[in-house]
Structure formats: C-alpha cells, structure tokens
C-alpha cells in the first residue's frame, strides 16, 4: 500500500504568505497530521507540493517521497505529477494536506474494502447541506461522481458527497490518468473522472464529519481547533482528569495527563507534554513540551522543554526555560528563572533568582536574589553548586565557579573564585558605622 498526499495548493482564502498546509492545528502543521496517519497504514508515502514547495519540504520526514506540481490544474493533474510513485502491482491511497483529521481507522476500513476486488474505493458521507461538494450518484451497482459546479438541477437534492479520499488499484489508475480531460466548468483535471471510468467501485461511509473537514479559511481552522480541543478535554475527563473550566483550558491533542490531576482555569498545555498523576496545574500556567512527574504543583508559571520529577513545586510566577531539570522534591518559587540547569533533589530556590547553565546538587538553599552570572560577553559559563551548600540572599556567582559541598556564601557576596567544601565564602565590602553622623551633618547644614 502506498499513500499519496496532495498538498500543492496555495490556500488563497487563508490570506497568508505561509502555505496553507503549514498552518498549525493543535500545535503541529496540518500536513504533519496527514503524513503521520498515512505512515501508519502505508509502506510508502509521497507528497505532491506546489506553492512554497521547499518551505513545506523542510517539515517533512526524510522517508517521504516529494513531487512538485508547478501549476495547479486539478487533483488528477497533481497525481499525474507523481506518476512515478504509482506502481502497477500496488494500491494507492489518496489523501489531502489540508484535511488533517482523517483517521487511521477509516483508512484501514477503506483498504480492507478495496481488497475485496475494486478498481477504486471511495470514502463518502451524508451531509444536510451538501452544497459545494461533488455528489456520489449510484445507478444499480455502478457509481459516478459529479462535481457541484457541473451538477444538474434534478440531482442537487442528493446528500451523499464525495469526500475526496480514494484507494485506487495502481494498474487501474495508470490506465485512467491519460484518459482524463479538462472539459468541465473550471477547466481542471478531476480525479473524480478516474472513478467514473471504473467498472468495480466500492464505497465506505464515515459519520465523523471532523475527519473529512477541509481547511480553506482561517474561520474553518479555528472551528476545527475548537472541536479538537473539546474532544481532547472530554477524553481527559473520561480518564480521571479534573478540568475546572474547559472553556479557558487549552490542551493539545498530543498531550498526556495522568488520573487525579487537576487543571485550573487559563492553563495551556502544549506540544508533546506529559503530566503525571495527582498533579495540580494552574491557574494561568503555560507548559510546552515538558515531562512532568507525579504529585507536582505548578502555579502561574511558564515551563518550556523542561523535565520536572515527582513531588516538585513550581511558582507562582516562575519561568523554566529549555534544558531545565528539576529533581525530586525540589522547590522553585516566585520570580525565579532557570535555563539549561539541573536542580538537585530537595533543593530550594524560592525567591527572585536567576539560575543559568548551572549544576546544583541536593538539598541546596538558594537565597533570595541569587544570580548566576553565566555570560561573559562572548560565551556562557557553568556554575557548580555541590550538595548541601547554602547561598545567602543577594549573592552573585560569577561563572565559571564552583561552590563546594556544604559551603556557605554570605549574603550580598560577589563570588568570583571557587569556594572549597564546608567553607565560608564572603565577597562584599566591610560595613562601616559612623555613630551620630546624621545629627552632625544636619547641624552643619
């Protein structure tokens, strides 16, 4: 089985300089949805590109065969541009880059039906308002497809529509393509004409209108996003996740969340994030591509491409940037930013700190206002803080630097050299007290 994805259109009605198939749906480009599904049912996948072909090509896996349709002259013309992809002894599944939610199950049903001896198998659906769609007309055991623009008045009441998804026998398709003409209202080469040439046609019906919805406008894309969002929320609710306000909760379809986790309002969980069991997330929190363990609490914070182990507390108003690893039972408090750093088990950074390019051990206390000065103007340098160290408030650790196990850094210090284990590090000016100075100064004035 081969799958050919037609994705050459510009998408004029999207009013965008970005190719239509690259517009994201629930966090990933529409074409990525289709290619992933195609790869589950077909041994080889090809894609026909057109507008901004090189830009789209960069998003595709290396195992996808790419063909280019220089001029968009219809669906059959797009398939002709990939003629070398079609093998006489193999079947070909036709998909579309702007119809992202076609399901693996439906495609498998089509393939199974097709293998009963068909030249072509069509996916159809019944719509209350079929206007704009080609109709599937049955005449005994024969089927033909008439495009909406070419439909005679007496057939406009037919509600069975052609979704555009087909499985073709490779032998039949190679014979049919040269016979297709552009003698129609739009002057294009329709793949539906190949169906009309077929002697052995089989039909599979879908009742899920989401999976056959094509995206031609931003309005449709937003509608599809909302339908997919609510479908995901319903799935999570059925599997033991509490979502306090579905209307203000945005969770990408690829996200996984464990049972007994509570999601508060205004929470965004995106990408390939995985959240464990018995967590509390939000309110007003954004999580992107994170691995989160069990019993984790994240409040009013942003976490991006980070790993958070069990029993960790984050926030409020913390920011975890890419490469952050929070070990078990660590605590990150308000207005703390962490980047490319590992925070050890039981370590606390509760207030107003920046930790970048650092390796922090177990049970370390990071005092309020601690800064790792990692950038020297040319490169980022590492800071090492070993187990049990205590960093006093308002300290600056000028990297590269190492704070030894159990060492103590006095509040207000600027540390530029390594501090040995169990040592006191001080780096501040000596305090001067002048008794009565204020009164004396006032008399002079």
From Swiss-Prot:
Protein name, UniProt field: Bifunctional protein GlmU
Region (Linker): 219-239
Principal localisation: cytoplasm
Protein family per UniProt: In the N-terminal section; belongs to the N-acetylglucosamine-1-phosphate uridyltransferase family. In the C-terminal section; belongs to the transferase hexapeptide repeat family.
Residue positions binding acetyl-CoA: 368, 374-375, 393, 411, 428
Cofactor note: Binds 1 Mg(2+) ion per subunit.
Keywords: Acyltransferase, Cell shape, Cell wall biogenesis/degradation, Cytoplasm, Magnesium, Metal-binding, Multifunctional enzyme, Nucleotidyltransferase, Peptidoglycan synthesis, Repeat, Transferase
Enzyme Commission number: 2.7.7.23, 2.3.1.157
Function statement: Catalyzes the last two sequential reactions in the de novo biosynthetic pathway for UDP-N-acetylglucosamine (UDP-GlcNAc). The C-terminal domain catalyzes the transfer of acetyl group from acetyl coenzyme A to glucosamine-1-phosphate (GlcN-1-P) to produce N-acetylglucosamine-1-phosphate (GlcNAc-1-P), which is converted into UDP-GlcNAc by the transfer of uridine 5-monophosphate (from uridine 5-triphosphate), a reaction catalyzed by the N-terminal domain.
Catalytic activity: alpha-D-glucosamine 1-phosphate + acetyl-CoA = N-acetyl-alpha-D-glucosamine 1-phosphate + CoA + H(+); N-acetyl-alpha-D-glucosamine 1-phosphate + UTP + H(+) = UDP-N-acetyl-alpha-D-glucosamine + diphosphate
Residues annotated to bind UDP-N-acetyl-alpha-D-glucosamine: 6-9, 20, 69, 74-75, 96-98, 134, 147, 162, 216, 321, 339, 354, 365
Region of interest (N-acetyltransferase), ranges: 240-445
Lineage top rank: taxon: Bacteria
UniProt pathway annotation: Nucleotide-sugar biosynthesis; UDP-N-acetyl-alpha-D-glucosamine biosynthesis; N-acetyl-alpha-D-glucosamine 1-phosphate from alpha-D-glucosamine 6-phosphate (route II): step 2/2; Nucleotide-sugar biosynthesis; UDP-N-acetyl-alpha-D-glucosamine biosynthesis; UDP-N-acetyl-alpha-D-glucosamine from N-acetyl-alpha-D-glucosamine 1-phosphate: step 1/1; Bacterial outer membrane biogenesis; LPS lipid A biosynthesis
Needed co-factor(s): Mg(2+)
This protein's record includes keyword Transmembrane helix: no
GO cellular component terms attached to this protein's record: cytoplasm; membrane
Keyword Isomerase: no
Molecular-function annotations in GO: glucosamine-1-phosphate N-acetyltransferase activity; magnesium ion binding; UDP-N-acetylglucosamine diphosphorylase activity
The protein's assembly and partners: Homotrimer.
One Pfam family cited in the UniProt record for this chain: Hexapep
Biological processes annotated in GO: cell morphogenesis; cell wall organization; lipid A biosynthetic process; peptidoglycan biosynthetic process; regulation of cell shape; UDP-N-acetylglucosamine biosynthetic process
Cell compartment(s), UniProt: Cytoplasm
Residues that hold Mg(2+) according to the record: 98, 216
Residues covered by region (Pyrophosphorylase): 1-218
Enzyme class: transferase
């Amino acid at each position: 089985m081969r799958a050919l994805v037609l994705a050459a259109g510009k998408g004029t009605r999207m009013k965008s300089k970005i190719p239509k198939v690259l517009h994201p749906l629930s966090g990933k480009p529409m074409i990525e949805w289709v290619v992933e599904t195609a790869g589950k049912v077909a041994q080889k996948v090809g894609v026909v590109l057109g507008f901004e072909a090189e830009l789209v090509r960069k998003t595709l896996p290396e195992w996808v065969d790419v063909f280019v349709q220089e001029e968009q002259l219809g669906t059959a013309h797009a398939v002709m541009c990939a003629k070398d992809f079609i093998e006489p002894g193999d079947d070909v599944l036709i998909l579309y880059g702007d119809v992202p939610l076609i399901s693996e199950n439906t495609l498998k049903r089509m393939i199974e039906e097709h293998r009963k001896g068909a030249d072509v198998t069509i996916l159809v659906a019944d719509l209350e308002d079929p206007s704009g769609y080609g109709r599937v007309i049955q005449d005994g055991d024969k089927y033909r497809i008439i495009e909406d623009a070419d439909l005679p008045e007496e057939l406009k009441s037919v509600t069975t529509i052609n979704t555009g998804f087909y499985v073709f026998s490779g032998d039949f398709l190679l014979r049919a393509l040269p016979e297709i003409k552009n003698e129609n209202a739009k002057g294009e080469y329709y793949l539906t004409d190949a169906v009309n040439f077929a002697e052995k046609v089989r039909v599979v019906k879908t009742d899920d209108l989401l999976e056959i919805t094509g995206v031609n406008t931003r309005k449709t894309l937003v509608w599809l996003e909302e339908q997919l969002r609510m479908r995901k929320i319903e799935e999570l609710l059925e599997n033991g996740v509490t979502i306090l306000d579905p209307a203000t909760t945005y969770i990408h379809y690829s996200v996984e969340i464990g049972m007994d986790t509570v999601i508060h309002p205004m929470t965004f969980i995106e990408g390939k994030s995985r959240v464990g069991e018995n967590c509390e997330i939000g309110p007003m929190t954004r999580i992107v591509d994170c691995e989160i363990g069990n019993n984790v609490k994240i409040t009013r914070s942003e976490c991006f491409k980070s790993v958070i182990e069990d029993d960790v507390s984050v926030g409020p108003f913390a920011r975890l940037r890419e490469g952050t690893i929070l070990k078990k039972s660590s605590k990150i408090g308000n207005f703390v930013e962490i980047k490319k750093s590992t925070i050890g088990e039981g370590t606390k950074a509760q207030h107003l700190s920046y930790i970048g390019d650092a390796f922090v051990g177990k049970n370390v206390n990071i005092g309020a206002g601690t800064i790792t000065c990692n950038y020297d103007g040319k490169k980022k340098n590492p800071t090492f803080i070993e187990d049990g160290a205590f960093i006093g408030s308002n300290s600056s650790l000028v990297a590269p630097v190492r704070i030894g196990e159990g060492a103590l850094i006095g509040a207000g210090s600027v540390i530029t050299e390594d501090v040995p284990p169990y040592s006191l590090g001080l780096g501040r000016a000596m305090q001067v007290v002048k008794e009565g100075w204020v009164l004396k100064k006032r008399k002079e004035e």
